[in-house]
């Protein structure tokens, strides 16, 4: 499939270059801002995938995203710079050799403070939207799904947790936390609070903080991105 280069402005190019947090001959990692789609979508605005044309070489080859983040999720996202790297990383992802660690804000601390959630999910289409729902193990179409969480800080106004998906289902962390009665702040789709004791939630409060992956040249590489200002501000305002 030949893709036409996206029509990027100099501001677009400067923006995507400013998000680079790691680059070598094989991979390039970005700290994705919230509100930017990874790929596709019905919104006419540029996606991160479009913006990768800023890194196109003279032969027309350009980096390819290895995985995705939801539009309102901020943080680390990885692209492969060569076809062999894309193939290697795609296989590693399928074999669950990526370790993804997220930070999330909740209205209250989970109980227990740390646990693994093992709850199968099934995709459901409602209108033009896709949702994931927790279902029984023997439900047709059920996909095994496990997530780990641990509470990093908690107070009367909320909690900050580290979340780690052990499988790679759509919306997995969001649905699993809602399933235990602790939906993420700002997660409209899965019942999260839109307001907090200190004001409105700016978005889904989920940030991909750290990604550890096998590098095409050997060994493992870890890339980290600090939470953006909206996340850090709300966390501080909640006394966390």
List each model region and its residues:
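Pseudouridine synthase
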Residues: 38, 44-52, 83, 119, ...
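Short acidic, glycine-rich loop/turn motifs
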Residues: 167, 213-220
């Amino acid at each position: 499939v030949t893709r036409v280069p996206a029509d990027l402005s100099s501001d677009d190019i400067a923006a995507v270059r400013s998000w680079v947090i790691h680059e070598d001959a094989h991979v390039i990692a970005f700290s994705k801002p919230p509100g930017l789609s990874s790929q596709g979508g019905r919104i006419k605005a540029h996606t991160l995938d479009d913006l990768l044309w800023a890194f196109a070489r003279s032969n027309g080859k350009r980096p390819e995203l290895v995985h995705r983040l939801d539009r309102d999720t901020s943080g680390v996202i990885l692209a492969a710079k060569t076809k062999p790297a894309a193939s290697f990383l795609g296989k590693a992802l399928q074999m669950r050799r990526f370790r993804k660690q997220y930070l999330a804000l909740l209205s209250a601390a989970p109980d227990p403070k740390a646990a693994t959630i093992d709850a199968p999910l099934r995709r459901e289409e409602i209108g033009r939207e896709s949702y994931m729902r927790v279902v029984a193990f023997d439900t047709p179409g059920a996909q095994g799904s496990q997530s780990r969480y641990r509470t990093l800080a908690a107070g009367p106004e909320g909690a900050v947790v580290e979340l780690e998906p052990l499988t790679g289902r759509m919306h997995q962390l969001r649905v699993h936390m809602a399933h235990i009665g602790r939906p993420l702040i700002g997660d409209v789709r899965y019942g999260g609070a839109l307001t907090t004791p200190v004001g409105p939630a700016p978005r889904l409060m989920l940030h991909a903080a750290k990604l550890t992956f096998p590098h095409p040249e050997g060994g493992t590489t870890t890339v980290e991105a600090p939470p953006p200002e909206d996340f850090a501000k709300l966390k501080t305002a909640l006394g966390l």
